[in-house]
Amino acid sequence: ADWPDVRTLRLEMLTDTPLAYLETLEHAHCRREWEWRAWARDGSSADSITVAAITASGRWVGTMMSKVPHGAPAAFLYGVYVAPDHRGEAAGVTDALLSRIEDWARDRGDTLSLEVNEANPRAVAAYRKRGFVETGVTRPYPLDRTLRELEMRKPLR
């Protein structure tokens, strides 16, 4: 991946929906070029995948990442973002990205899990619509411990 595109999309993500990520915009702005280059280079491996939606003009408009944490029985979805002007069923970006992640995750386990901030009802609704259900497990959001992260899971088989 081209690191300037990765950086631009990450900064857009953190500006648009700061509660959705475990990094602040201020922290991202402090990253050095070599860090962005490493992030772009290391996007996928045997136990992780990064997918991106890129328009015909080359603009990055969405991304999702998944990994199988060490010792975990299934994949975890994170780093989800679709640009506001590409959201919604008509655009199909979310479904296309998620379909690719699910295909990858299906080879690694029976479920796909995620954590979503309770203060992001749009995301919670989008995940529910796509078959994710809350497990009842919650955790404090690391950047604001007054908020909770809801664990959601989707069966893949």
Please state what every model-predicted region is.
Residues 3, 43, 72, 108, ...:
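A generic structural micro-feature
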Residues 76-77, 92, 111, 122:
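Amphipathic alpha-helical recognition patches that constitute DNA-binding helices
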Residues 7-8, 12-85, 98-104, 140, ...:
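Acetyl-CoA-dependent GNAT
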Residues 2, 102-103, 107, 119:
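Short N-terminal alpha-helical targeting/association segments
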Residues 31, 72, 88, 92, ...:
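Residues at secondary-structure transition points
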Residues 108-124, 128-157:
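C-terminal "cap" of GNAT-fold acetyltransferases
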Residues 82, 89-103, 125-129:
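Conserved acetyl-CoA-binding loop-helix of GNAT-fold acetyltransferases
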Residues 1, 71, 117-121:
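Short, surface-exposed acidic/glycine-rich loop or hinge patches that mediate macromolecular interfaces
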